[in-house]
Amino acid sequence: MANYVRYIHNDDKVTRNDCVTRAISLASGLPYSAVRKKLRYTARLLDCEKLCVSCYEWLIREVLGGRPVNCEGMTINDFAELHPYGTYLLRMDGHISTLIDFTVYDIFDCRNHRITNAWKMPNN
């Protein structure tokens, strides 16, 4: 089973509903505040809600260079077994998490949750 690390990362170290910003910040190596600004800019540019999948997917793919990876029918743990190395953003229904070298970083243990989207991030 993949490793799990409880990960809270934002400017004031408060646990909040910020999974998109937190996960993208960790996976990209960008500061939390910079990702928050990029999400707002992307939302204005594309006229979409910044937490809508199609909106933040554009940021992940077009700006940050993430590329889609097949994850059909997999849990995070299944995915980690197939992709033990590298940095990935993994989307579940209503949530997104980061997998780095066989370790899931998130505010809760989601290793058994089913993935709907996965992106491999370039090396930081």
Q: In which residue ranges do the predicted regions lie?
A:
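Alpha-helix boundary/interfacial micro-motifs
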Residues: V35, L39, C110-R111, A118-W119
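Low-complexity, intrinsically disordered short peptide segments enriched in small/polar/basic residues
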Residues: A2-V5, D101, N112
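Active-site nucleophile-adjacent alpha helix/oxyanion-hole segment immediately C-terminal to the catalytic cysteine
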Residues: M1-G65
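Charged phosphate-binding loop/patch that engages nucleotide di/tri-phosphates or the phosphate backbone
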Residues: T116-N124
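Low-complexity, compositionally biased segments
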Residues: V14, T21, D109-I115
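Conserved active-site-adjacent core of cysteine acyl-enzyme catalytic domains
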Residues: A43-G94, I100-D109, T116
